[in-house]
């Protein structure tokens, strides 16, 4: 095997005309018509939202309900996993201790904030 120092100049020589007018394979590729993108139908059929053309499938699907009778996979315990926390943000809704933005900010050195500030 060759050293890395020797291989780099070899690659530079091998690919010097790559993707240029001298690259016959690349020029043939450019002449081809563009391919159409793949079409995937009903890729989100389980996710809800657009519910047209689904027939009676959504009316009585009790086998897909979890333990707590909510919609989801069988026995999916999402409500138990989140313990009442919202999904959207991680901002603490109920603080355990008071929040002071600066060490000795608006309320001075030895003053507590009003009761509803928590």
UniProtKB/Swiss-Prot annotation:
Disulphide bond pairs: none
Secretion signal, residue range per the UniProt entry: none
GO biological process: 7-methylguanosine mRNA capping; RNA 5'-cap (guanine-N7)-methylation
UniProt biased composition (Polar residues): 76-93
Region annotation Interaction with RNMT: where it falls in the sequence: 2-55
Modified residues (Omega-N-methylarginine): 85
Keywords of this entry: Acetylation, Methylation, mRNA capping, mRNA processing, Nucleus, Phosphoprotein, RNA-binding
Record-listed N-acetylthreonine modification sites: 2
A Pfam entry, by short name: RAM
Modified residues (Phosphoserine): 36, 86
Region Disordered: start-end pairs: 30-118
Subunit structure: Interacts with RNMT; this interaction enhances mRNA binding and cap methyltransferase activity.
Protein name (database record): RNA guanine-N7 methyltransferase activating subunit
Organism field: Pongo abelii
């Amino acid at each position: 095997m060759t050293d890395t120092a020797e291989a780099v100049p070899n690659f530079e020589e091998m690919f010097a005309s790559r993707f240029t007018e001298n690259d016959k394979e690349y020029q043939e590729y450019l002449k081809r018509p563009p391919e159409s993108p793949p079409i995937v139908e009903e890729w989100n059929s389980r996710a809800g939202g657009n519910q047209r053309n689904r027939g009676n499938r959504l009316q009585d699907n009790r086998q897909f309900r979890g333990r707590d009778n909510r919609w989801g996979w069988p026995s999916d315990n999402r409500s138990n996993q989140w313990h009442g926390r919202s999904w959207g943000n991680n901002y603490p809704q109920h603080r355990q201790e008071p929040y002071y933005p600066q060490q000795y900010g608006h309320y001075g050195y030895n003053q507590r904030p009003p009761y509803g500030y928590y």
